[in-house]
Every structure is written in structure tokens, then in C-alpha cells.
Amino acid sequence: LGDVYKRQIKDMQLAAKRIAVFWAPNMSLGANLINLLSKLTTTKLGKDFDIDITDLHHKHKKDTPSGTAKFIQEEIHDSLNKIKVKKKVNISAFRSGDSTGEHSIIFSGEGERVIIKHISSSRNIFANGAVRVAAWLHKKSPGFYNMSDFLKI
């Protein structure tokens, strides 16, 4: 399942008692990897660095910011809470041209910046990710799985 807004999490958790259920806001492996890298980077730099997210998609995309950007923001806030840091993580969303999707997480400190970025150039990556996850999930016991489980991180 790739429901961006977590609307049906409770139903999915109930189903996971009987079958293997997978949830991710984005089925791109690269987009999920930058999320995991951002969480790690937040635990190391979050205390001293400002954190911002950029979200670029085609001009016809309806949601602003995207579900992926909101999910990354939420995960970064969770990582900040773990290191007991309270700060705002801004999202700057742009809808322009025909971009399939581009997300950057920018950690800005004194005299340096760390930028974690993912650019999708084809919508095929979402289908390819879903197919790979489905093949993996097929072998799993009942439970509620996410991209961290799939990527083994």
C-alpha cells in the first residue's frame, strides 16, 4: 500500500494480524533512502544546524507540499525529539514545469551545508519499487512492514 496520508493505518494494522501489510508514502527506493539518511543526519547535526526541505514537482500536482515532503518532515521531527531538540523544519514547495519529483533536505550550519537530494526522472521508479517490495512481502509472515524493514536499515 502506498497511501501518502496514513488515512487507513488502523485498518492496515488490524489486517497485519492476519497478513503481511506494507506501508510507505512513496514507493521509490531512492526517496526512501534519503528519508533514512536525513533521520541519521538529524541525529548528528540537528542540534547545531538549521534544517529545510525543498519539494519540486510538475505544475499539475495538486498537493503542496507533497506527501513525501511531509513524511520526511515528520521523520526529522521524530529524530529531533530523540535528541531533545525543538526546532521548526520548513518545507519550500514548488510546482513548475514537468518535474516528476525532486526532494532536498538541507542542513545549514556555520560555514557549511549538507544537502541530501533525490531526483526522479521517471514515474517508472514507483512501479519498480512496488514490484520489488511485493516480491519481498510475499515471503513475509503476518505483520506491519515499512520501507526501513525492506531496506534492512
Task: Label every PLM stretch briefly.
Residues W23-A31, H58-P65:
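Short, surface-exposed loop/turn motifs that are enriched in glycine and acidic residues
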Residues N32-D48, T64:
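Rossmann-like NAD(P)H-binding beta-loop-alpha module
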